[in-house]
Amino acid sequence: LESRNPADKTEIVATYPRSQVNDVDTAVASARKAYRSWRTVPAPARAEYIFRVGEILLQHKEELAQLISREMGKPLTEARGDVQEGIDCAFYSAGEGRRLFGQTTPSEMSNKFAMTVRMPIGVCALITPWNFPVAIPCWKAMPALVCGNTVILKPAEDTSACATKLIEIFQQAGLPPGVINLVHGVGEEAGKALVEHPNVDLVSFTGSSETGAFVGATCGRTHKRVCLEMGGKNAQIVMEDADLELALDGAVWGAFGTTGQRCTATSRLILHRDIKEKFTTMLYERTSKLRLGAGNDTDTDIGPIINEKQLQQVSKYLDIAREEGAKVLIGGEIASEGSLKNGYFFQPTILDRVTPDMRVAREEIFGPVVALIEVSSFEEAIAILNDSNYGLS
């Protein structure tokens, strides 16, 4: 597998093995063996390892942020925040090692004592996306490890270098062999093998709704515990009495932060008709000043799309928007001029005259595209906001 810089596709960041079923078998066997002893380590002692991970992450924060920016493309300010979330998660999870409380409950019988005790589940497969390559693996792995589980991380192939560096930091913290494992590969091979493996007890997945549906159905058939975080079509409502400057800040960051490549991105702006024209002008002016560029360029506001496939997906939705009758106020095209010629860049885009039934108002685009929908009342705005096929709001 090749990991390339999305701001300059000619640059190979790293190469990694394309793990197959036998590699997954090896990782699961390693995690299963380690689980037998790791689960007996007292929770406060397990938490000390995770606290050390947080300390090492703090020492390597800038190095990791630079790697995220180079491999995934997000601006350095965002990349530093990505690492900081991992650091915060480490220290929080470590604190929970002394708070894994159970419960005592009254018994109907005088010679009985009733209580609950938290017990680890077993081997956990963690399948993570590329948009938060440090934060999301940390969210998943750290609580699981403190609770006495062992884990296998299968990151998105676009951010293999970030995942490798993160696992090296876990190793530096002294975790016993087999407690945390890394499997590179594509979803249809390594990911599928993990989800279907009989010795995996829990699957935690963050990614597309289509893949998540497969993961959920498979875990249902095999009686695995499962946690799914999938797509969203999130909206921001701006009413006639809103603080428009405050709303504008939220709209620009929500729509174009991380190049719109977040399941929580603001892809719909629901605007009251009394302020729509004024707010649209404000949004246009702010959007026109946003600068495209490589993530490690300090002048960059919006980085590249992750890869060619996703770039073409965003472009396809702009064709759909035009066919459905939406008006492109700004952007709407692949950007390839000058220093952007070797990257996967898409212009920040505002779509006007969007109605709630259009595909661009209902389907996740995962790019720097925001759709404007006009309403005449708060009740209408709420109804449109809630009319979504996705679980995230």
Task: Please state what every model-predicted region is.
Residues 4, 8-100, 111:
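Glycine-rich loop-to-alpha-helix module at the N-terminal edge of alpha/beta enzyme cores
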Residues 35, 39, 54-61, 65, ...:
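Structural signal for hydrophobic packing residues in well-ordered secondary-structure cores
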